[in-house]
Design a protein with these regions (language model features):
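Early extracytoplasmic/lumenal segment of secretory-pathway proteins
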Residues: 24-89, 211
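Sec/Tat signal peptide C-region and signal peptidase I cleavage site
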Residues: 19-23
C-alpha cells in the first residue's frame, strides 16, 4: 500500500514538473499598436515560439509613455513594441530601455532606428497623419475639401473638426511637433490657436477622429492615415488627404527587462515574417526586403514634414504643458 502511494506521488510530481517545464513563459509587452491588430501579431509570434506567451498591455502613445516613465524605478514591462520613436528616445534617455542588438538588424532601414551608436530601439514601421474627410457629410454641409493646413482655419469648418489630444495620443503629438518644427515656434502656436476655433473636440485616441469622420459624427478628422485607408477600404465615404507638412514617426521595439524570452520577442518583431504583417497596414516598414502598398493609402512621401525625433522627445514635456494650458478645455472626457 505504501509503495503504491509513493509511486502515485512520484508520478504526480513528475507530471507537475513536466507541465511546468513546458508551460509557456509569459512576456509582458507594452504597446500603442491599434487594438484590432494585436491578436494577429500575438498569434503569429506564438505559432513560431510556442514556449512564450505575449501579455499585451495597450494604451495610446502618450498614456503608455507616461506609464513607462512612472514605472521607471519598478518597471513592469519587459518589452515595448509599437511605440513612437520620439517616446522611445525619451525612454532610452531615462534609462528605461536597455541597449540590445537583435538578430537580423542588418536587414532594417536605418532611418527608422535609434540613431545613436548604442542602439536600444528599432523601427517596425513608419506611420503618418492625414486628414480624413467625409464626402457625404461635406456635401450635406456644403464644405469644400481642404487642400492645406491653412484651409482648416477657415470659418466654414467651425465645429466640424476632431483631432487627437497630443498629451494622450502620439498621433496628435507628432502633428503638433510637425507644425512647430516646420512653421517655427511662434507661427506654429498661432496656427494652432486659429485651428482651435474650428475644433469640435480633442480625442484621447489617435485613430478616433478618423473613425468619427467615417461615421459622420464630424466632417473632418486629423488622424492616422492607416486608419483612414482601412475605413475607406471597408466602405466609409472618406477621402484621405495629406496636406504638405504631414507628421510622421517610426513605431519601434525595445528591451526593458533583459531575458532570453524578451529578446526573442524583439528578434521576431523585426523579422521578415513580422514585417509582412506590418505592410498590410503601413506603407513603409522596417525590413528592407518587404515592400508593398496598403490599400487606399495616400501618397504620403511627397508631403512628409521634416522631423527631428530627438527634438520631439526632449521638447515633449514643455510642448504638452503649453498645449494643455491653451487647448485642453475642448478635450473629450477620459473613459
Amino acid at each position: 500500500m505504501k509503495n503504491r502511494f509513493m509511486k502515485g506521488s512520484l508520478a504526480a510530481l513528475v507530471t507537475l514538473l513536466a507541465g511546468n517545464a513546458y508551460a509557456a513563459q509569459e512576456v509582458t509587452v507594452y504597446t500603442a499598436f491599434e487594438t484590432d491588430i494585436l491578436a494577429k501579431y500575438k498569434n503569429a509570434f506564438e505559432s513560431e515560439n510556442p514556449d512564450i506567451n505575449i501579455k499585451w498591455v495597450r494604451d495610446s502613445t502618450g498614456i503608455m509613455t507616461a506609464k513607462l516613465l512612472a514605472e521607471k524605478n519598478n518597471p513592469r514591462a519587459e518589452v515595448v513594441w509599437g511605440l513612437a520613436g520620439s517616446s522611445m528616445a525619451l525612454l532610452k534617455e531615462e534609462g528605461i530601455l536597455k541597449p540590445y542588438t537583435p538578430h537580423g538588424v542588418e536587414a532594417l532601414r536605418s532611418n527608422l532606428n535609434d540613431p545613436q551608436s548604442t542602439q536600444a530601439w528599432y523601427g517596425n514601421d513608419a506611420f503618418f497623419n492625414a486628414v480624413c474627410f467625409n464626402e457625404v457629410v461635406a456635401k450635406q454641409l456644403n464644405l469644400p475639401a481642404p487642400k492645406s493646413w491653412d484651409d482648416l482655419t477657415k470659418p466654414i469648418y467651425k465645429g466640424h473638426i476632431a483631432m487627437p489630444n497630443p498629451a494622450s495620443s502620439g498621433t496628435g503629438y507628432m502633428q503638433v511637433s510637425a507644425w512647430l518644427q516646420n512653421m517655427g515656434e511662434d507661427q506654429g502656436w498661432n496656427y494652432m490657436q486659429k485651428l482651435d476655433q474650428n475644433i469640435a473636440h480633442y480625442t484621447h485616441s489617435g485613430s478616433k477622429p478618423c473613425v468619427q469622420a467615417g461615421m459622420g459624427e464630424v466632417a473632418i478628422g486629423i488622424s492616422m492615415a492607416s486608419r483612414g485607408a482601412k475605413l475607406k477600404t471597408q466602405g466609409a465615404p472618406l477621402s484621405v488627404i495629406t496636406p504638405e507638412g504631414i507628421g510622421w514617426e517610426s513605431e519601434a521595439v525595445g528591451l526593458v527587462k533583459p531575458s532570453d524570452a524578451a529578446q526573442r520577442v524583439i528578434d521576431w518583431s523585426i523579422s521578415k515574417a513580422a514585417n509582412e504583417l506590418y505592410i498590410e497596414m503601413y506603407p513603409v516598414v522596417g525590413h528592407q526586403d518587404v515592400t508593398g502598398k496598403a490599400e487606399n493609402f495616400p501618397n504620403v512621401e511627397k508631403n512628409m514634414a521634416k522631423m527631428d525625433f530627438a527634438r520631439m522627445g526632449s521638447e515633449r514635456a514643455d510642448v504638452l504643458k503649453t498645449w494643455s494650458e491653451k487647448f485642453d478645455a475642448k478635450s473629450e472626457p477620459k473613459s
